[in-house]
Every structure is written in C-alpha cells, then in structure tokens.
C-alpha cells in the first residue's frame, strides 16, 4: 500500500470548494488566508506526522457549509438558514433586553392608565402639581416609563411588528404602552405634538387593522378639532392647508388601505359615519367666525372627558395581562371550580379585573353599606366588588351549564351595566343601539337580544340581593326579587 502524501491544502481546498463559489470575489481574502495556512502546514517535518494520518482538525468538517459573507450575521439574527444549521435564531442583545422588559413596560403602562383614568379634575391635578405626593409619584413613574420606552423605539409610539414583538402578550403590552403614551401626551406629561397624535390615533386605539368603533370615531374627530384649534393659535400656516391636512379628502381611500382592503371594497358603517361627521366638522370650522371663540365651542376639557370615558369603558380589556392556563387551573382548583384550558384562555381579563378597576377609579375594596356611597360609583365597579367579595364564600357546587347556552363574557356584562347606567333603566332596545350590531359605542352585545339582556340583568340584581349588598340604581327597576325567586 503506497504512502499517502501529506498535502493539507488539498483537504482545505476540497472542503472550501463544496461551499464557496470559485467565482465569488467577495471571499478572495478568505481564500488567501486559507492558502497561507495550507503553506504553513505543508512545512511540517515528515517525522512528526504518522503515515496515513489525517490532519488533526479537532472537529468534523463534513456536511458543514462555510459562509463568511457579510450577510452571514444578518441571516443569523433574522432566523434564516446559515452556517452550522442552528435550531433557533440567535437574538441580538437588544432584542433580549426588549423581551425581558416586557413585564416592566406593561406594569408601568398600567400605572399610567390607572392614574390618567381618574376623573379629569383629579388626573389634571396630579399631572400639573409635581410637588404633591401623587404628583411626585407620577413623575417618577413617567421617568421610568421614558427610559424603558426608549429601549424599544425612539419614535413617538411603539410599533410591535417593526421591533420583533410578535407574541400575543408582547403585542398586548405594546398596545397598552401606546395608549399610555397617547394619554400622557394629551395631559402634557409627554411632549408629543398633535400631528403625531393624529397620525397614530388609529394605530393606538384600533391596532392590527381592527374595525373602528363609533366612540373611537368620535374621539378621532374631536382630536382633529383640537389639533386645528392649536394650529390656528400658532398662526404659522393658512387655514385651508391645516384643514386639508387634518381632514383630507381621501379619508375613504386611507381607511381601505389601513385594513388592506381592495380599493373597490365598501366602507364599513362606522367608517362612513366618521367621514360624514368629519366633512361636516371641516365645513363648520372653515366657516366659523371668530376663530378665537372655537375654544368655547369645543373646549379642551370636553375632549379630556371623552378620553376618560373611553378608558372607563375599555380599561379592563386594554390592560388585561394574559395569564398562563396552568396558573389559572391551580387557582380554579383552589376555589373548587373546574374549567377547561380553552375557557381559561378565552377570558384572561377576569383574573385581574377587580384589582385594575379599583386602581383605575379609586374604588375601595370595602363593603358598600349605604346607597349614598354608591351614587357616584358605576354599576360595573360595584358588580365587580361584590363578585370579588363573594368568591371566597362560594360552595364547591356549581350549576351544570346548558350545553347550547352561550355564557356571558366579562366585556358583555360590563356593556350591559354601562348601558343600564347610560339609559337610566331597563330600556333594552336603547342599550342594543349603544352596544348591539353597529352600536354607537361598540358592538360587544351584537350576539344578544332583548330577552337575554332582561334575563341577565335580573340575575345580576338577584346576585346583589343574595349577597346582602345595595343594588345599584340602574338595576333597581329591573324585575326580580328574593321573595319570588
């Protein structure tokens, strides 16, 4: 058997030839480096190398493709195919930091929403009086929020898709953060101009191409009005240019592009309403005289009140933090209740809504023992408080559910109670006008009819009576009492 001549360059060149295009000029430097290494290895003394010996590389090169092109590291970070076939993409340090700070971003956003979700006078006093106890606490929270937010983006708002926040919990957190940014800017705690607020409104309040609700459209129009008043006060641009920027003639086209619809598709009912109202508002602003009196017709305080009303109606769903199914199961077993995993995931806001509602609107967790104390408290908060207090006294027995009956979600219960408060009693058709199909405020109750509203309201009233608590004024006119039931 003849001896094999030792020529390391053949092995290196052979392996290199498997993965590298010989005509590639970008790898010329790598070839030269390997050639020098081959020449150095060829100078090894023959007596130090055993016959038939292979080069002791220390690892197996077979099946491994070399890729030292400039896009190698980019491919690694983007999770594409790259050398060594790693099973998972390698995240950048910045991405790891953003992921680890998601809980912090969510907690700070919840605190800001809870403070700015208070009545307008109370929230304004906190923001404008940094020397007060609450003002100092809010200032510290805002400072921490700015530092954490800058880790995610230097823009005014956080775009989750642009920074790789793709999981449901991450997107939910960035949505709450954007809402906190918007409200802080409205109250003057963050320096963001009306232009950016107007441009990002739909992304903040109706993200991920979701349908715009009627109350969101009202806020959208009022924001444009306040932006116009502010721009006219600065007197830097002609009135017509400002109106055309805020109320463009191609709003219908923009709505379709926003939700990736075809240009020949029809607008939704709410989108048509928004365009009609914005067109009328634009004409009124253009013909209004004197312009200085606009502040009296469209006061800033009214806009703040509408923002606060939106928070009141949507805070629990916006700031609900997803809870793992296993932790929900453990808590359910402790209370003697049994749920399926799908049920636990479908209503994550129920677990922490009592705490967040109390935090947002300053409602104490003590028992309400008199009707005078409940006059200024919404039925939603009262219902949550009583349910929270009675959860610890529930028996292990649970009524068997009817298979074909659709259980009420927390959002539906809140909409029903809010509707009872707004229409001042059991006016079921009016409640459906607010929350039913094409509702003026939302479509939470679009799958409910008047009979279902009546039955649910009756059960809610009985719930208060059986708990020994004062029935809210909105439920007092609902049929049902303990003597008959």
Curated annotation (Swiss-Prot):
Short name of any one Pfam family annotated for the protein: TRF
Disruption phenotype: Cells arrest in interphase and have an aberrant chromatin structure.
Record localization: Nucleus
Any one Gene Ontology cellular component term annotated for this protein: chromosome, telomeric repeat region
UniProt DNA-binding residue ranges: 428-453
PROSITE patterns given in the database record: HTH_MYB (PS51294)
SMART domains, A to Z: SANT
SUPFAM superfamilies referenced in this protein's UniProt entry, alphabetically: Homeodomain-like
Predominant location: nucleus
Span list, region Disordered: 1-23
Composition-biased stretches (Basic and acidic residues): 1-20
Top-level taxon in the UniProt lineage: Eukaryota
Keyword field: Cell cycle, DNA-binding, Nucleus
Domain HTH myb-type: 400-457
Stored InterPro entries: Homeodomain-like_sf (IPR009057), Myb_dom (IPR017930), SANT/Myb (IPR001005), Telomere_rpt-bd_fac_dimer_dom (IPR013867), Telomeric_DNA-bd_trans-reg (IPR052833)
Cystine pairs: none
Molecular function per GO: double-stranded telomeric DNA binding; protein homodimerization activity
GO process annotations (BP): telomere maintenance; telomere maintenance via telomere lengthening
Entry function: Binds the telomeric double-stranded TTACAGG repeat and regulates telomere length.
Subunit architecture: Homodimer.
Name of the featured protein: Telomeric DNA-binding factor trf1
Gene: trf1
